[in-house]
Each structure stands twice: as structure tokens, then as C-alpha cells.
Amino acid sequence: MHRAFSLYRVLELSKARVECVFELGGLVYVSNSNGDLDSYKIYNNEEEEAADFVMEHVDVYPNFTKKPITKVVSCATQDIFYALSDSQVYVYQISTFKKLFSFGAHCQNMCLYGDELIVLSSKKNLEIYEIQKNSKPNLTKTISLNDRPRSLAWVSPTMILVSLSNDFCAVNTETSRISSLNLAWQQSSSLGLGISYIGMSIKSNKLHITRISDDEVLLSKDSQGLLVNLKSLQVSRNPLRWPTVPQAVIYNSPYIITLHNQYIYIWNKETYAMIQQIGISNIYSTFSCHKNTFFTSNSYVWILTPEDFSNQIEALLNTENLNEAISVLSQITVSQFPKRDYYLRITKREKALRSFSSGDYDLAMRLFSEISESPSTVLGLFPGLLDNNYSDAISILSMAPSQNESIESNVLFPGNHSNSQTDLRNGDAVSTVANNKRLRSLSTYLTDSRRKANRFLSYDEEHYFLQKKNLFLNADGTLVAKEKLEKIAVQIDTTLFLIYMISSPALVGSLLRLPNRCETSVVETNLLSAKMYRELVEYYYGKSLHEAALDLLTKLCDEPTDTLSLKGKSNTTSKYEPILSYLEKLSPELDHLIFKYSRVPLSEDPQNSIVIFIDENSEASTISKGVVLKYLETISYKVSIIYLEKLLLDNKFNDTVFPTRLALLYLKRILELEETTDFKNQEVFKQTIEKLEDYLTNSKQYDANVVLQEINSQDEFLSTVSIILYRRLSRHQDALDVYLKILNDWEGALSYCNSVYSIDGETEPYYMLLAEISKNYKSGSLNILDFITKYSSRLDLNRVFPLLPKNISMKSYHSLFSSQFRQLFEELSNKETQSKLYQKRLEDLNEELTKVRSEKVVITREKTCLFCHKRLGKSVISIFPDGSVVHYGCAKKYVSSNHLPYEAY
């Protein structure tokens, strides 16, 4: 315990009883039972040793009120205060103490909400008043309760917390709804039972409402206290326990003050620890002012004033009560104690050092994080870590801290570490369990420091120094320079990497995938020795060390499969999958690396490797197709063909350039194969020609003229290719020349003519072939008469007769002319039949027209529409085949409603 408050007797009373004490404008006012109001000036009396505080009488306001004042609340923004006297509320001006007006009746208590609202409790009612500037408050609502309210506290503009005789409730001022808090009070023996010969009575509970902050309130019932969150109206912590039922409960940050029969107890709000016990008795009233608390008895007025926080903290530190010092400092503000941040830092720092020495590494590192201790200083607890070359991470991090390399204690705490450090070095700390605990706690601290360092480094110079409160500080409390912070960030990431390597290898990948500042040499050495190639490749990628990554992947691909420790590698037929996956992630600006390291995979496994330039998820697919194709041609025509074929399948050609280049590449590939020995029997040669023929036949995008120019007319293996191109260009004579002069294939030429006719309906090739037949009739070509007879329906006889041989007898023409006559007769017969059908149809239509014209409908004045049942009159009508008559506008609806098998127009 330490001395947090001092109690002084400041005023000896005369015959008048003190009913109220309050502070206004730097003076203390005492309301006496006779209605007089005395003002006092309170100050330290340094001349006398017996009394440190003196209340010097300043003025008196005789008969200030008819009855004594029992409670005062002030509203400094409006220069007024409210005084409760004789069950009424009087409003006075603070500067002049002039009474302005009064309001309320039968009032027993009051509570102010800012300068907007005031609530009065009278008997079993709550009266809500709206404060109006320079005028009397306006009563807005009266709420009835089941019991007399004792104490009040505003929760929000629409919610009031009220204590009744035995419970607390929340009152909604808008809806007048009253809700019990239903708090979990535990049964206490202090309630007691009073038993006498005439009966039994239960002592009533004493309930108190003490406002802690805008978000929290302390509710006291009997000998218990509950901290309640005002937003949720839920208990936030375990209950406090008073030694006896308190007469009053007061909050003076950061302490809770309870008045009992013979003592005043001071409690720490956070730890519930009793800080101080002060003896006092015969107190009948308590008044809490802005800073001080006044107690009155029948003879004296006492003042309870807080000690200076500097003295309190010094006392706690001198007694090495660090936990209590940290708790007190955490609850107060800089306005209460200007050196609050400094003392909080050095106290937490000392607590962290002692926790580390005693083996509580988690607490130590958490405290170091809270005070933003420099990582360089914390890492000093691990000897040799900062100066070593990191080649042997396990031996470095498993060492216990030595006395020389530990953080030096602050001058406020001399000589507190040597023994504990010696025990740590010689005891359990060198064990595996202790070392793992140290590593885990250090990793937690470094993770938090890493986040802070990255944020601090993102600040500009001006903003950096404005954030002094949050930045890393050196051991002497000075700010870590931004230049040094860069080096510290490297130490943090590198050390965290080493810790993960030892204690949590699974986390190494997640660290290296994020932006980091790890030392490259350290990462390479440790990951290579551990054969964690996948993590090393990810690190290289994050650092843009792409050549190093690709060199490593190339080396690993050349090794046997069982030595390739690339975790997560998918089952694939390509051993170059790791290289290809890495190349897919490189941006187009790094095309020189993509081309350099994809050459070997493309040469040996083109089908699987070419995907890096095709897949839409690959960055390499955005490289210009022309650039890629030019590069692929330096590897082989085969790879280039595969590339363009896959593009063709994806319909990525918008012009004739690349489709034409694909055809030309086929030709180059064929010529390349023709230079090999025994190429005629090679399956690949046959397949390439078949692919070219199929492509030229089915594709519509290539430029046939360009392709045709590259074909050697003397190459018999490309004759079919030439024919396809001639046909595409409608150069049928050239195509027939290839059939007849190069291939000597008359049947093939005839098939060509039939194919052109069946697809395009063109008959010109027949005449060209007929001309060739007539020239070579004697050389055993096709029989010209059989040809003309067979295809006479497709030919014009006027063009055919000049081509007929003149040295053939007329008898030979019998079959030709017979077929012609049969064809002409058939055409004539078809025309006559068609004419008769047309005539019959015309007669049927005329008959139907006559019938329709003969039909009539008589519309009388009484005839109505079958749909709307209104008279038809002279309206436009629709007549249906069954004789139904409706309005023209009702026709469609009539058809729809009756489901008729025809439409109305």
C-alpha cells in the first residue's frame, strides 16, 4: 500500500450544522442548517506543522436560503448553478450569486445532463426538464415509478439510471419504459436480520450510483460493487467486495473511495487492490467536489485531498511495486501527471526486464511492444545475435543472455538483475523448453515491431517526428533516427526469419512471400542448407532476384526427381513445370529473362512449355505475338507451329498475318524434313503435309497468293497443296494442269470438277476438262461422249458441240442425244404439270372468293357485340366464319377468351 490521499481537519463547527459543501470559482461554500452560506478559501498552510490545509473565511451570505441547501450542481457554460433546498430547485448566477428563478416541488434529488436537461426526483416520480437559456426550465415529461428514487445518473439523453430501495433500473425518457438491470448480486451476510420480541425486520440495502466515466458507472449494493458498461448496461468485470456496507462511494480518478463507520478505504479501480486505509469516525455526510472530497461530522469538516502523483509513483517505485505503479499510470492522463508517459515507460521497461530474467518471456515481450522499445535493445538480450554472420542460426538463438550483454537497468532501479541473470544462464533457460519459450515470445515481439517499423518508414520526415509518441525509442528515451530505423527493420526481419527456421518452419514461406527486409545472404544460406527451395524461390521473386531464382530452378530440374524438394509440386509430365510457373509470373518488361530461360523447356517439351505464351493467366501472354513468334523461330519451326496452332484454336487471329505465317511455317517445316534422309517414310513428314492440307482447306484467313508463291511447283509432295491454293484463288485451269500434267490423274481432275460444282455450283471446270479431253482424245483419256452424256445436265450443249470429235459416226451420238431428248421431255412435262396445278389453285381461290362475297350479316339496331354486349350500331365490325359478329376493337379479346383456332387482325 502507498499513500494516495491525505485527510485534514480544516474547519471546526459552531452551533450550526453543515448541510452541504461545494466548490465554485476556486472557493469552497458551506451551507449551514440555519440557511446561511459561508465562503472559504482553502490553501496549504506551510507555517504551521499541525495543519497542512486551512479554510480561511472569506464571506457570508446570511439567510441565503430559508432552508439549508442539500445539493448543488453547476453549469459553467451558462454561468449558473442549481441548488436543492426545501424540496425545490433554485437557480443562481455563479458570478453574482443572484437568484434567477426556482422550479420543481417535493424534490428530493436532481441530476444534470450537460447544459440540455435536468431530472428531478420527487416522491415516486421523475420530472424531466429541458434547460432554456435565460429562462425557467421547461417540464417536458413526468415518469411514475413504483418506488422512491434514491440516486440518479444520466446514461444518454434518453436514458436515466435510477437506484430504488432495493434495485437499480433504467428509465427511457422517450417511451417511459422502466427496465430492471437484473444484476447478478451475490448474497451477503451484511444484510443481517433484526429480531426483537415484537417481530422481525430486514435492514434496507444501501444503493449507490457512482459515475466513473462517460462509458462506465459503479453500482454499489450492500457490500458489493459492480462496474457496468453504460452502452450495453452489462457488467464488465467481477464484483468488488467492501469490508462493510459503505456509507458513501466516490470516484476520484483513478481511485474508488468508500466511507465506512470507522475508516475511509482507497481502492484501485483496475486491480481492486486496497491502496490505503484512513481512520475516521462519526461522519454523517460526504460531499465530492471537483478534486477534493469533504466529510462532515457534528464538530468538524474534513478534507480528503489526493497526493501529487509524482510522490505516489516515486513511493511505488521505491518499494518496487511495479504492477501497482503501472496500473495507476495507465489510468491517469497527462493533464493529471505531466510526466506520466516517461514514468510509465521506465516502469514497464523495468517490469519487462525482470519478467525476462524470471522466465516470463511472453509478458516481457508484450511490455516491450507496449512501450515501443527499440528492437536493437531487445535483441541485445540474445548475445551474439546482432554481430554474428547468421551462418548458424540454432547456436546463436539458443544461447542464454549474459550479464554483460543484457539491457542495462534504469538508474531508478539499480542492482536488480545480476542474480536473476546468473540463475537464468545456469538454470532452466538453457534447456530446450526454455529456449523454445524465448523464441516464441521473441517472434511475437518482432512481428509487432515489424508492423510498426513498416508503418514508421512510410512516414515522411515531418510526419515521422510528429509521431514521436508511437515511434521506437532508445534506452535513454530518445527517438530512434529514421536512418537507423532502416537497419533496425533489416534486423527485425532477419531475426524473425531465423526464429521461424528453428521453431516454426511452416511460417517461413508466409514471411518471405510478404514484402520483407531479410538479409539475402542469410536467407540463401539457411534455406539451401534446409533444402527449402520453394521458400527460397518465393523470396527471390519478392526481391525481384529473378535470375537467381531461375538459375536455382534450372539446376533443380537437372537433378533427379527425388532431390527436387519443391513442396506442393503438382503431378505433371513436364519436369520444367517449376520454371514455367515462375516465368508465367514475370511481367512483359522482363521478356529477355522469359526468352532466356524458356529456351530449354521449349526445345525439349514444346507442347507443355508453349502454354506460358498462351494462357491468359500468364503475364508472358501479353508479350507481342510477333516478338514471341520471332523468338520461337530461332528455336525451331516445330515450336512456332505449335504456338500458332494453339492461338488458332483460341480464335485469336483478327487478320491474315499470322494465319499466313502458320501456312508458311508448315512449308518450311516440310522443306526442313525433306532435307533429312528417308523423309518419305517418316511419319512426322506425312503428318505435317496432312496438317498443312487440312489447314489450307478449312481455314479462311490466310493469304493464298503469298503461300502459293513459296511453293516449288516441281515438288511433287506439294502438288495437292498447290491444287488447294489454286481452288481457293478460283484458278481452276492451273489446278487441272497440276492433275493432268504433273500427276497425270484424270480421275482426280474429274473429282475436282465435281467438288467445285457441288460446293460452288460452278460449271466452268467441266468445260476446261472437256477441252483437255478433246485434245488428248486419241491418247486414251476419258471418253468424251461418255463424259458429255453423264454431265449433260450441267453443261450448255452450244458450248459442247464445237468440242465434239468430227471423226466419230453419228451412231455414236445416239446415247447422247437420247439422254438430251429425255431430259427436254421431262422438263416440258414438269412445266405442263405445274401449269395445271396453278390453274386448279386459281379456280379454287375464285370459288372461295365468290362464296365469301355471297355471305352477309344483317346488323339491326338491337344487335349487340358478343364480347362487350354493347350495340354494334354503325361501328366497324369483325365477322367470324361461324357468323359471330363483334366490334373490330373487341375481336382479339373475343378470340382469346373463346380460344378460337384463328387470329383476329
From Swiss-Prot:
Please list the GO terms describing molecular function.
guanyl-nucleotide exchange factor activity
Instruction: Give a yes or no for keyword Repressor in this entry.
Output: no
Give the main localization category: membrane
Gene Ontology terms: cellular component: cytoplasm; cytosol; fungal-type vacuole membrane; nucleus; vacuolar HOPS complex; vacuole-mitochondrion membrane contact site
Sum up the protein's function in the record's words: Required for vacuolar assembly. Acts as a component of the HOPS complex that acts during the docking stage of vacuole fusion. HOPS is required for vacuolar SNARE complex assembly. It remains bound to SNARE complexes after vacuole fusion.
Q: How does it assemble?
A: Component of the HOPS complex.
- This chain belongs to which protein, by name? Vacuolar morphogenesis protein 6
Native organism: Schizosaccharomyces pombe (strain 972 / ATCC 24843) (Fission yeast)
Lineage, top ranks: Eukaryota, Fungi, Dikarya, Ascomycota, Taphrinomycotina
